[in-house]
Amino acid sequence: MFPALQKIVVSTNASPLVGRELASNSTWIWHVERLPMLLGIPTVILSLTPAVLRLLIKPLLFVPIRYSSFVLTRLITPVLKEDMLEFESTADKKSPAGPKAKGKLALTSWLLSRYPASLKDRMSQLIRDYLAITFESTPSTSGVLFYILIELAAAPELAEAVRRELREVAPNGELPSTHLNELKVMDSVMRESARVNPFSHLVLYRKLLRPLKLEGCPELPAGCFICVDAHHIDFSPQLWENPERFDGLRHYRARQKPENGNRFKFANLGSDAPGWGDGPQACPGRMFADNTIKIILAHILTHYDLELPPGQGKPEKGSMPNGSMSPDTKAKVLFRSRKL
């Protein structure tokens, strides 16, 4: 299921970022969905290679990702040129720009208005920024969506509860962006899945630029890496009742209290939700990811029933050497079309 979800996420992300034409372009989708592996595999190989050999093999290992970057650059350049012409013809360069009629966000205008005047090659910088955004938004969103669907496939009654909410919020089958915040049951399922199946066991990596003394600890030297243990926050019995159990309505119930109306949301920051980071370094794309996942879930749950194959439980969780999630790419979920 995971490879199929990656294609869906790439296409859904691309529509508001680079336009619907590229969102349905098979070449764009093919290269974007491979970027994480084209970067990850050479990085792991280099980490296991003796330092004296790294300079020799590094150029060869990164040939595939350089080629994919070349292809993606060729595809996106005409889109960015059109965006730049539109930006230059706008009288007020600092005015916030909303989504265009064709559904594409004015991300280019937003970036251009914030680039320093001293920047000479704005096109090259735009391409780098767009490819970085495209790369960062693909594996994390796909992984989170993978585990949400696994949990829903294992709990058909929970999936039906989300469908009931969808029928109430979007009775005519239309779901405008203004209604996404009303999907409180869906949001609770998303947050609970992210708690039980976190994107990473370790978060907020920092490299110390000078020695640091923490209370109760020896002095940490400059150059040392520190991080936050997200795993023991997500599974803390002081924060969560029965933390080992997946409870899709856990956060929905918590939000029924008046004082919690704006708490316990999927995209919220806080000491009990370490996955997004915190402060000025918190994930800037978390609201975009929130909307993307809700749109995809709404479509899937409206049009399909899903369940795990007979005799198969939830797939085992894997993790990368850095603690990031590693979904089971061979896991299967059964989909059956629903009568609308």
From Swiss-Prot:
Protein's pathway: Secondary metabolite biosynthesis
Residues annotated to bind heme: C283
Topology in membrane: Single-pass membrane protein
Membrane-traversing stretches: 37-57
Segments of this protein annotated with the region Disordered: 308-340
Cofactor entry: heme
Subcellular location(s) per record: Membrane
Gene Ontology CC annotation, any one: membrane
Mutant lacking the gene: phenotype: Impairs the production of chaetoglobosin A but leads to the accumulation of prochaetoglobosin IV.
Any one GO MF annotation of this record: iron ion binding
GO biological process, any: secondary metabolic process
UniProt keyword list: Glycoprotein, Heme, Iron, Membrane, Metal-binding, Monooxygenase, Oxidoreductase, Transmembrane, Transmembrane helix
Transferase as UniProt keyword: no
PANTHER family in the record: CYTOCHROME P450, CYTOCHROME P450 MONOOXYGENASE AN1598-RELATED
Function: Cytochrome P450 monooxygenase; part of the gene cluster that mediates the biosynthesis of chaetoglobosin A which has a unique inhibitory activity against actin polymerization in mammalian cells. Chaetoglobosin A and its intermediates are involved in the morphological differentiation of C.globosum. The first step of the pathway is the synthesis of prochaetoglobosin I via condensation of one acetyl-CoA, 8 malonyl-CoA, and a L-tryptophan molecule by the PKS-NRPS hybrid synthetase cheA, followed by reduction of backbone double bond to install desired geometry by the enoyl reductase cheB.
Name under which the protein is recorded: Cytochrome P450 monooxygenase cheG
Taxonomic source organism: Chaetomium globosum (strain ATCC 6205 / CBS 148.51 / DSM 1962 / NBRC 6347 / NRRL 1970) (Soil fungus)
Gene name tied to this protein: cheG
